Every structure is written in C-alpha cells, then in structure tokens.
Amino acid sequence: MVEFHEKRGNAVFGVRVQPRSSKSAVSGPYGNALKVTLKAAPVDDAANRECCRLFSKLFSIPDSRVSIVSGAASRTKSVMLEGLSAEEARSILRNSSIPGL
C-alpha cells in the first residue's frame, strides 16, 4: 500500500522511477511507494519534469502544484501535491485504474 504523509497540509508520497521506458505511466505499487515508468531519459531534468506532469494529470491539478521534494537525482523520490491532503490523494489513487491499488 502506498504511504501518504502530510507536510504543511500537502500530500507527500514516495515514487520509484524507471526512466527510458517504452511509455510513461504509473505501473502500480512498489513497496510503500508508486512505481512510475517514464519515456524521458534522466538528462537535464527531463525525467523529473515528465514525472511531475504525469502526477498532475493523475490527480487533476496544475503542473505547478506538483514538485519533487527529495531525490531529484535518484530513482527513489518524494513527490508533493500542493493543495491536496493525504486523504484526498489516497482517495483519488484508490479510484484510479492503476493495477494493484
């Protein structure tokens, strides 16, 4: 199960990224985090930007409200969703079509 934490009223959760994949998608749970496959290579912050865009679509919030708070140069990251509580984010994720959730 994906663990959500709250930091100053914003949802924060862990992500495991697999860059240079055939498609960009949320694959499912990875321990206490979400596994994400990204088409972008981890060069010039392209994979991080694509990761943020993917979560902005999934949670229906603007790109500017999704940020990587730790692990920008790592495959394991923490992502913050501004304006969504941990419970709201958990509910959206539960109602999504992502396998294994």
Curated annotation (Swiss-Prot):
Give the matching SUPFAM superfamilies: YggU-like
| Xref: Gene3D superfamilies | YggU-like
Q: Which SMART domains match?
A: DUF167
One GO cellular component from the entry? cytoplasm
Pfam families per record? DUF167 (PF02594)
Similarity-based family: Belongs to the UPF0235 family.
Looking up HAMAP family in the UniProt record yields:
UPF0235
Q: Which PANTHER family match?
A: UPF0235 PROTEIN C15ORF40 (PTHR13420:SF7)
Q: What is this protein called?
A: UPF0235 protein Plut_0338
Tell me which species this is from: Chlorobium luteolum (strain DSM 273 / BCRC 81028 / 2530) (Pelodictyon luteolum)
